[in-house]
């Protein structure tokens, strides 16, 4: 797969020098994983995902995203549509943008800074 057609890029070493991002995922889609988690009755989906130009969206030019979904409360259809539109298709966020309830997507640096300060996992409300 060429880099131009790839839905993700690897991180430039300078971007996250000294950071442990070993559990990041690089793949074409997070949607099959989320559906699998729903079908298996899991309580939540939590992952770090590397995507390309999520720039100019809610993700603040971030290539590494932290995704957390409370699968016991979040609406599956709404979550999957959100992931498809704003994460995978990298659509621009308009005035009508609303992140689904019980879903959280953050740039890695925001996640990292919160955890360093508060020492806990960030979960959606």
UniProtKB/Swiss-Prot annotation:
This protein's GO CC annotations: cytosol; nucleus
Protein name, per record: Uncharacterized protein C3G6.07
Native organism: Schizosaccharomyces pombe (strain 972 / ATCC 24843)
């Amino acid at each position: 797969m060429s880099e131009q057609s790839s839905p993700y890029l690897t991180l430039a070493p300078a971007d996250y020098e000294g950071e442990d991002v070993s559990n990041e995922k690089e793949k074409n889609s997070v949607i099959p994983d989320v559906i699998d988690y729903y079908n298996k009755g899991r309580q939540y989906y939590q992952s770090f995902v590397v995507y390309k130009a999520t720039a100019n969206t809610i993700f603040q030019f971030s290539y590494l995203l932290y995704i957390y979904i409370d699968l016991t409360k979040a609406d599956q259809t709404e979550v999957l549509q959100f992931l498809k539109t704003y994460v995978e298709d990298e659509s621009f966020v308009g005035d009508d943008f609303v992140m689904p309830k019980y879903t959280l997507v953050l740039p890695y640096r925001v996640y990292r800074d919160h955890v360093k300060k508060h020492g806990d996992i960030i979960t959606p409300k």
